[in-house]
Amino acid sequence: MILLFYTSSFILDCLLGDPYSWPHPIKAIGNLIKWLTIILRKIFHGKSLYFAGGLLFVLTVGMTGVVSWFILFLSAKIAYWLYVAVFVYLGYTTLAMTCLAKEARKIQRTLADGDLAAARVQVGMIVGRDTDKLTAEEISKATIETVAENTADGVIAPLFYLFIGGPVLALMYKAVNTLDSMVGYKNEKYRAIGFVSAKMDDIANFIPARLAWFFLVIASFILRYDGRASWQIGLRDRKNHTSPNCAYPEGAVAGALGITLGGTHEYFGETVIKPTIGSGNKPVSEKEISQTIHLLYTASTIAFIIFASIYLLLF
């Protein structure tokens, strides 16, 4: 029965994505992080911000777990059908496959129309780097990198934790991931208060990122891209990133499409030097964005099928 709930959550994400007008736990988690960060910055200063960052992590993830568990508990007390609906809905909100694909397609269409200014604004909504000076090719690369990375932490990781611990654990993972996306930067403003969140996100994504690489390789073979290069580049360039995890899915995609990703970018006006991922020399355009979206859907479906099969065998 629980497997049916997980399947329903996955299908809902495939069909609906994340409608902007719907209530969403991740939005609430983001607001909680903003509120806690403001309060902690008023109390702690200097080196003590490292301790504040630890508190921020514990409070955010802890409150997410407690509140989501209580909502499920309360719904079960009211009616079983309500419990099922809440269970499925909470699981669905942790998955970002269709939402990610929609955002990438918007950028793809805008680039195809030649509206570079609008494409810069759109890509700025899904990446952390500065986008006001990006070329069309750089926008395409930024989009591809984000789709590749979020195949891991926006789909495969929440699926992984959903199958292990239900929507409560999946939402706790999303809290970790949201913390990293909001405060896990290495610049002067966030280095201290975001240190714990960044490290814990690295730990939480350690297994899912490597699974994402494997599923993307399989997807590359299925889609008749360069599956062999996807395997090789993912392994060869796995350390070519400031994160210990991101280069795995990015390398798999770079190899599959025969392109080069990564390199030096600007974040909040500061230049961050990164090595490149991949060795392909062909120009990158909106065509490669479309191919990356195909990889996203295929790898995510493979992940769900494999996780569901393992769940059936064990339970």
UniProtKB/Swiss-Prot annotation:
It is a multi-pass membrane protein. Its main location: membrane. GO terms for molecular function: ABC-type vitamin B12 transporter activity; threonine-phosphate decarboxylase activity. The keyword Membrane applies. One of its GO terms (biological process) is cobalamin biosynthetic process. Pathway: Cofactor biosynthesis; adenosylcobalamin biosynthesis. InterPro entries: Cobalamin_biosynth_CobD/CbiB (IPR004485). It holds the Pfam family CobD_Cbib. It is found in: Cell membrane. GO terms for cellular component: plasma membrane. Keywords: Cell membrane, Cobalamin biosynthesis, Membrane, Transmembrane, Transmembrane helix. The chain crosses the membrane at residues 54-74, 78-98, 152-172, 203-223, 295-315. NCBIfam families: cobal_cbiB. Converts cobyric acid to cobinamide by the addition of aminopropanol on the F carboxylic group. HAMAP family: CobD_CbiB (MF_00024). Belongs to the CobD/CbiB family. This is Cobalamin biosynthesis protein CobD. The gene is cobD.
